[in-house]
Amino acid sequence: MYEQFGVEGLITFQKTVDYCHEKDLIVIGDVKRGDIGSTSAAYAIAHLGKVQVGAKKIPAFNEDFATVNPYLGSDGITPFLEVCKEEKKGLFILVKTSNPSSGEFQDQMIGEKHLYEMVGERVAEWGSELMGDSYSYVGAVVGATYPEQGKLLRKVMPKSFILVPGYGAQGGKGEDLVHFLSLIHI
C-alpha cells in the first residue's frame, strides 16, 4: 500500500521499518516479490540485504522477512535464499493464498498433486538449507480460508513457519487455525 504514494510512500515504509526495529519488533515485508534471477537479486538486496555504495555496504529497507512469489521458479527464489543465508533473514513464500481466485492456478493438478502442494515441497526443501533451532527461515503463506489445504501443507512443511492471512474479514475462523500449527516446540 505504501508504493501507491510513490517515493513519499517508500520513504514512509522505510520509516515504519526503522520504527519497528527501534521497538525490537520483527518486520515482515509483505512485498510479494519474484522475478528473473538478476531482478530478484536486486529485490533481495533491497528488502533483506545490503547494497554496496562506494566503500560501504548499507541496508535499504532492511525487513527481517519478505514475502516472495515462487511462480518464476528457483531462478527467482535462489537470490533471496542467498541473501537470507548471508544476512540471517527469512522468507515467506506464497504457497496457497487466501484470495478467492487463488485456485485458478494454485489448485491445478500436476500429476497426482496440486500445484500448491508441489510449491510446499519446494519450500520444505529450500528451508532445509536455512534452519534455525527448530524452524526454518523459509516459511510459507497459506490462507486461513483454506483449512484443509493448511492441514495438508503443515504435514508437507513441518519445520516451516506459516504466515496465515485471511483470518476474520476474509472468512478464516479461529477453529481452523489449529491446522496450521506444528508440534515442534520453539
What is the predicted function of each stretch?
Residues V17-H21, L81, K85, A124-S128, ...:
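Surface-exposed amphipathic alpha-helices with a cationic face
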